[in-house]
């Protein structure tokens, strides 16, 4: 969910008539609260453990997604992305869990894999979020380009679509995160 804005940036800029500075502000807001949030999440981890902290963070992720997806103004987009920056603090939880779930001689490798696959998430979301947005065009909120737009994502074949439902895709990613947060709470333990 933290990476769900960039795949739709061009569409959102076009729909809202944003200036380049406004588009950049929205991107900056996505990380603006991440650093202080990582400190707060770290303190919550120490007090409540990774299972509860991560579950609540995933459930919380639905809130900024729904705010951003239902935005009607630049200011509402900014608020949604600022609140989304807190979700970026989830990285801290994975570091802690990796350290607790693996023996000391394997923690470095495990955290390297965790960090590497975490970065892969940004590239993967560029593909999946657009596909999700196209698949949800039958729902209200689709943005009509007026004529087909071509999308080329990574090494996959280009495709064209006249409609892209970025709002439902972003809202849907938040809802999926919240559902996964509930699943996580009932199926994961803090330590092995």
Q: What does each of the following model-derived ranges do?
A:
Residues 58, 62-65, 80-81, 174-181:
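A generic transmembrane-helix signature of 12-TM secondary carrier transporters
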Residues 1-20, 125:
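Extracytoplasmic
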Residues 134-137, 174-192:
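C-terminal membrane-cytosol helix-exit motif in multi-pass small-molecule transporters
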Residues 36-75:
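Conserved MFS/SLC helix-loop-helix module at the cytosolic interface between two early adjacent transmembrane helices
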Residues 80-117:
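Cytoplasmic helix-loop-helix junction between adjacent transmembrane helices
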Residues 109-140:
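Glycine-rich segments within core transmembrane alpha-helices of 12-TM secondary carriers
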């Amino acid at each position: 969910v933290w990476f769900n804005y960039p795949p739709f940036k061009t569409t959102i800029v076009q729909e809202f008539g944003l200036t380049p500075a406004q588009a950049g502000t929205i991107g900056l807001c996505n990380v603006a609260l991440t650093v202080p949030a990582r400190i707060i999440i770290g303190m919550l981890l120490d007090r409540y453990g990774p299972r509860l902290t991560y579950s609540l963070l995933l459930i919380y992720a639905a809130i900024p997604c729904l705010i951003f997806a239902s935005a009607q103004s630049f200011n509402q987009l900014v608020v949604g992305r600022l609140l989304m920056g807190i979700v970026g603090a989830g990285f801290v939880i994975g570091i802690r869990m990796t350290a607790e779930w693996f023996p000391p001689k394997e923690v470095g490798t495990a955290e390297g894999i965790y960090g590497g696959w975490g970065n892969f998430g940004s590239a993967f979301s560029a593909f999946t979020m657009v596909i999700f947005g196209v698949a949800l065009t039958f729902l209200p909120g689709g943005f009509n380009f007026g004529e087909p737009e071509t999308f080329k994502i990574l090494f996959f074949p280009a495709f064209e679509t006249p409609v892209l439902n970025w709002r439902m895709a972003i809202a849907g990613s938040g809802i999926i995160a919240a559902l996964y947060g509930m699943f996580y709470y009932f199926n994961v333990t803090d330590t092995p």
